[in-house]
Amino acid sequence: MAGPVRVNAHITGTVWKIEVKEGDEVAEGQVCVILESMKMEMPVEAPSAGRVEKVHVAEGQAVSEGDVLVTLA
């Protein structure tokens, strides 16, 4: 991997559940965070495999489209 990979929110909503923790190894396509918007749950997947370097959000936190949720190393 060339550098850190950001997992961004693709919608504005609320962090419903965080599926990973710092230090976890994730696969491409693995769900990292589940967002809730308009009573719908929307999974946010890792764009590539890597190790979770930082989780930038907490459950219940409001996020906007484009916000960084997780950074992979």
What are these regions (language model features)?
Residues 50, 55-69:
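PDZ-domain C-terminal substructure recognizer with occasional recognition of PDZ-binding tails
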Residues 1-14, 34-47:
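Short beta-strand-turn/beta-hairpin segments enriched in glycine/proline and small hydrophobics
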Residues 12, 23, 31, 49, ...:
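ATP/adenylate-binding site constellation spanning eukaryotic-like Ser/Thr protein kinases
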